[in-house]
Amino acid sequence: MKLNLNKMLLTSAEKRNEETVNQLISLWKTVFGDSEDYISLLVPYLPIFDCYVVKEDGKIVSAFYLLPSEIKVGKNFYKGSYLYAAATYEEYRKNGYMSYLIREAIKDKENELDFISLVPANDGLYSYYSRFGFEELMYNFRTRITCDSENNKQGDIITDGERVNSLRKSNFDYLHLFTDSAMNYALSCYGHFGSHFKVMDDSAVLYIEDEKTVYEGIFSEREKDDFIKLLKDSYSGEITVLSPYSICENSEKRKCGMILDFSSELKNSGGVYMNHTLM
């Protein structure tokens, strides 16, 4: 049955409208429980993100955002969007609103982009998104390393998305990444919770979640032994590392998101590395 919904892809003017922005913030806060300070980090970036909404009686009741993204496979780059912060008020759920929005976005983007990507908020949602053609094509490796250094090596914090992306592109061959502007938004979100990228030496850049999780080490596969040595010389206790490849015997490969591949080429890559998740 075709739903007769007030579906909107918000225009640039609408994304600058105070009432519209307040409704988006209210929906996010109600569904996800985040603080207004955190949610408001999105506002300056709204002009560069697509926002799909359903309205009932003039009120936004369901919405999600598409963040500009890329996938690198070898020397080739594919243009796409990352589906983010899908939310519907509880009293409006089970009406097909979110499914309708996703299908509309797919129709809008299938001839414009190479892919749409997303990371389900929990494992139970993988089957939901598979209905729309999304496949489990993103992964990362988790490794636990015991370190015994008495040092806590410091580094220079990086806050520029373009620099972070440049480092990632030069070291990783198969990866999902946000565009520079979207990465700046992601960095502001990480920073809100005290996480950041920092240069540890000339070649390794770490995103430290809580000084016990190295959320990402930017290093080429041939440099993995040097990277492990850097960790052991810099931290004490057990450190969890996420990376695009196995770095020792206890590395565990994990699924980390889905791709709707309009290009029909990404699924032949064997999967791409995904780490910088926003949900």
What does each model-found stretch correspond to?
Residues 2-23, 152-166:
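A short beta-loop-alpha structural element at the N-terminal edge
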Residues 20, 24-72, 172-196:
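Active-site rim helix/loop that mediates acceptor-substrate recognition in acyltransferases
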Residues 53, 59-70, 80-87, 117, ...:
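Conserved beta-strand in the GNAT
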Residues 78-90, 211-222:
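Conserved acetyl-CoA binding element of GNAT-fold acetyltransferases
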Residues 85-88, 94-107, 222-233:
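Conserved acetyl-CoA-binding loop-helix of GNAT-fold acetyltransferases
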Residues 102, 109-121, 235-245:
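Conserved GNAT acetyl-CoA-binding A-motif
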Residues 130-151, 215-225, 229-279:
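Active-site/acyl-donor-binding loops of N-acyltransferases
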Residues 135-224:
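Amide-forming acyltransferase catalytic core, primarily the GNAT-like/NAT-type
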